């Protein structure tokens, strides 16, 4: 890239470049996407599967950035659509909003592509990208997991983690000055 860039600020490179259809088909067709959850992406997966495709491609670096951005938008929109359809099939509450997080949220072009793809699929979800939510996502998740412990509910789900069974992970530690504190009735199973 000229000038060199560590990342595509706001998606400007992707927005001003052409998607390479051959590379996009190769990326979208990676076998990992067909695996059932739980699954996780990591640096090793990217280096093993994606980097070789990029190196073998005849596309310019700018086109590769546009193509990979489109690939991410395809896969995020597809995963959201699958989740919404599963919720409908299993008669679960149908989601009305989705919290997006991670560095990609700061890529305006990527977020616009995801919104467009979801709209094209008939999904009109409110995509939450509020920095006050995104920047504190992990704290909110751990507060939610702690609440599940207080309520005596499993917070480690086999369907998500691959564990053999659901379980309650974590513990509640109260300071000594709260030794006479009474937990709510639902939480009396907890040893403090």
For every predicted segment, state its role.
Residues 70, 128-178:
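Glycine-rich phosphate-binding/hydrolytic loop that grips phosphoryl groups
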Residues 96-107, 139:
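Glycine-rich beta-strand-to-loop/alpha-helix junction loops that act as flexible
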């Amino acid at each position: 890239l000229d000038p060199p860039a560590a990342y595509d600020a706001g998606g400007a490179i992707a927005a001003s470049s052409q998607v390479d259809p051959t590379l996009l088909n190769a990326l979208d067709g990676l076998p990992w996407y067909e695996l059932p959850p739980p699954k996780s992406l990591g640096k090793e997966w990217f280096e093993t599967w994606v980097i070789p495709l990029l190196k073998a491609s005849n596309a310019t670096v700018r086109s590769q950035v546009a193509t990979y951005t489109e690939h991410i938008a395809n896969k995020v929109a597809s995963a959201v659509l699958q989740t919404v359809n599963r919720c409908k099939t299993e008669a679960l509450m149908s989601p009305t909003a989705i919290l997006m997080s991670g560095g990609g949220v700061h890529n305006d072009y990527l977020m616009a592509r995801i919104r467009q793809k979801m709209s094209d699929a008939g999904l009109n979800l409110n995509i939450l990208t509020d920095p006050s939510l995104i920047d504190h996502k992990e704290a909110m998740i751990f507060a939610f997991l702690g609440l599940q412990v207080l309520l005596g509910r499993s917070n480690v789900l086999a369907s998500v983690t691959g564990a053999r069974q659901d379980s309650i992970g974590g513990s509640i530690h109260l300071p000594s000055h709260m030794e006479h504190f009474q937990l709510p009735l639902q939480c009396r199973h907890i040893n403090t």
